[in-house]
Every structure is written in structure tokens, then in C-alpha cells.
């Protein structure tokens, strides 16, 4: 059995991406990468995460749209803007 890293963020917390202009609310957490190799390779190499860390499912939004995002812990930080998330799937 692998030793998975404990998740830093919790379900319901609002986080933002460190490099891209979007934020979202955590609705699920994978203890390590659980998506396709193709998806992983689509992430720019400069910020491509390792698989052995928590990955977060987010109800995400930016200034143009809302969507579901799958993001590694290393590329997220807590959002301290106090602005609400207005994603349609929250209501």
C-alpha cells in the first residue's frame, strides 16, 4: 500500500489556481492522480504535477465561464478573496 499525502484542502473550501486565473470550490479529492495519461501530458511541462499527491475536483469559474476542473495540490492555494463562488451546480 502506498503512503498517500494527506490533503491540504477540504471539501467545501474555495481555492484558486497558482498559475491560471480561475478559482473553485472543492467537491471531491483523489489521494493521488486518477485521470488519464493523456490528460496529464496536456498540462504544460513547467507546471506538470507528479502523480503522488492529492488531486482536487473543483466546481471552477473564471471571468468567462464555469466548469469542472481537476487540479493537483501543488498548483492550488487557498482563495482568501472572500468572494462567493457562483457556479450553477452549487444552487
Predicted segments, located by residue:
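Mixed-charge, Lys/Arg-rich low-complexity intrinsically disordered regions
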Residues: 1-14, 19-23, 30-33
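Intrinsically disordered, low-complexity, charged/polar segments
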Residues: 48-91
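Extended aliphatic helical segments
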Residues: 15, 25-26, 71, 85
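Beta-strand elements of modular eukaryotic interaction domains
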Residues: 14, 47-48
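Broad hydrophobic/π-residue packing in well-ordered secondary structure
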Residues: 22, 39-40, 55-56
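Residue-level recognition of conserved beta-strand positions in structured domain cores
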Residues: 26-28, 60
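Short, solvent-exposed secondary-structure boundary/capping segments
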Residues: 33-42
Amino acid at each position: 500500500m502506498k503512503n498517500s499525502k494527506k490533503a491540504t484542502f477540504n471539501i467545501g473550501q474555495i481555492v484558486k489556481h497558482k498559475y491560471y486565473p480561475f478559482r473553485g470550490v472543492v467537491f471531491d479529492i483523489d489521494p493521488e492522480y486518477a485521470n488519464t495519461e493523456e490528460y496529464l501530458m496536456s498540462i504544460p511541462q513547467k507546471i506538470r504535477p507528479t502523480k503522488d499527491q492529492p488531486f482536487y475536483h473543483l466546481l471552477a469559474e473564471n471571468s468567462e465561464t464555469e466548469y469542472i476542473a481537476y487540479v493537483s495540490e501543488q498548483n492550488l492555494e487557498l482563495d482568501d478573496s472572500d468572494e462567493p463562488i457562483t457556479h450553477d451546480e452549487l444552487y
